[in-house]
Amino acid sequence: MLFEQIAANKRKTVFIVIGFFIFVLMVGAAIGIIVWNNYLNGLILAAVIGAFYILIMVMTSSSVVMAMNRAKRITSKEQAPVLWDTVESMAMVASIPMPKVYIMNDLSLNAFSAGISPEKGAVAVTQGLLDNLERYELEGVIAHEVSHIRNYDIRLSTISIALVAVIAILSDLAMRMIFWGSVTGSRNNRKNDNNSGGGAQLIIYIVALVFVVLAPIIATAIQFALSRNREYLADASAIELTRNPDGLIQALQKVSGDTKKMKEVSASSESIYFSSPLKSKKDKPGIFDSHPPISSRIERLENM
């Protein structure tokens, strides 16, 4: 059951990622139709901006995320022996280099991981998590975060965030070009096409325009669907490492019952946390939720 769930989550992720890239290209094509009356120009624009933005995000993600979330690095075992030992042992079981260790001075119960590869991995936990979890519960949380690193989820999350940003940039660019009359020439060409093609070209233009306007919303929903799926995968992978579902289950129960809100958290980092630091812990999932409901995560773990 455990390995079947891991395999199913990986397959679902592949489909979502492929669909995400196709969606970005569709947005580019729609913009090409709107701005230049030529979908190929839009495809090229989307590919160039997308590649550049993803490269920048991947190169700077880890250090930026830690700074944005006020995480302070622990450089020796003596500073936090239990945390250090737990991260070290889980990394050893996962067969990855030991991630850098960080602590956030916050009383809420949460954690996150960063790093685009296992060699550049980092794990951060709140002081509240350290103070309130038993050792075996902490192992469950750390195993979850180490699984994110081992499964390259941070790289995937970084790319998905970059793609959402690219789509927002492309959509905004198209709207500005239309507003400032930069597409006058293409409008004239489109008008001539409408005269010869009956109104088909106008219909295509309107559909493309509506698609571009809605694209950022759809892209955000896709990004969060990917994030929710990777949370389920990290939970299952954590059990593979610890062989003790009770630790993670009880950690999730404590996190679910935690009423303290994080004092300082970056909204752009929401999806990488163990539990959403921004939204209430509800039982019903929403398409704009970065995490599945904790009750759903616990149910899946209990059924393994």
From Swiss-Prot:
Please provide one cellular component term from the Gene Ontology annotations of this protein: plasma membrane
Cofactor field:
Zn(2+)
Locate the residues binding Zn(2+). 144, 148, 231
Report the record's Gene Ontology biological process terms: proteolysis
* Broadest EC class assigned to this enzyme: hydrolase
What are the boundaries of the region Disordered? 276-295
| Annotated cofactor note | Binds 1 zinc ion per subunit.
- Where in the cell? Cell membrane
Enzyme Commission code(s) on record:
3.4.24.-
Q: Where are the transmembrane segments?
A: 14-34, 39-59, 161-181, 202-222
Superkingdom of the source species: Bacteria
* Principal cellular location given in the protein's record: membrane
Matches recorded under InterPro entries: HtpX_protease, Pept_M48_protease_HtpX, Peptidase_M48
The membrane-topology field of this record reads: Multi-pass membrane protein
What does UniProt list as catalytic? 145
Keywords per UniProt: Cell membrane, Hydrolase, Membrane, Metal-binding, Metalloprotease, Protease, Transmembrane, Transmembrane helix, Zinc
Q: Name one GO molecular function term.
A: zinc ion binding
Pfam short name (any one): Peptidase_M48
Family matches, as Gene3D superfamilies: Metalloproteases ('zincins'), catalytic domain (3.30.2010.10)
Which HAMAP family does the entry link to?
Pept_M48_protease_HtpX
Q: Which family does it belong to?
A: Belongs to the peptidase M48B family.
Q: What is this protein called?
A: Protease HtpX homolog
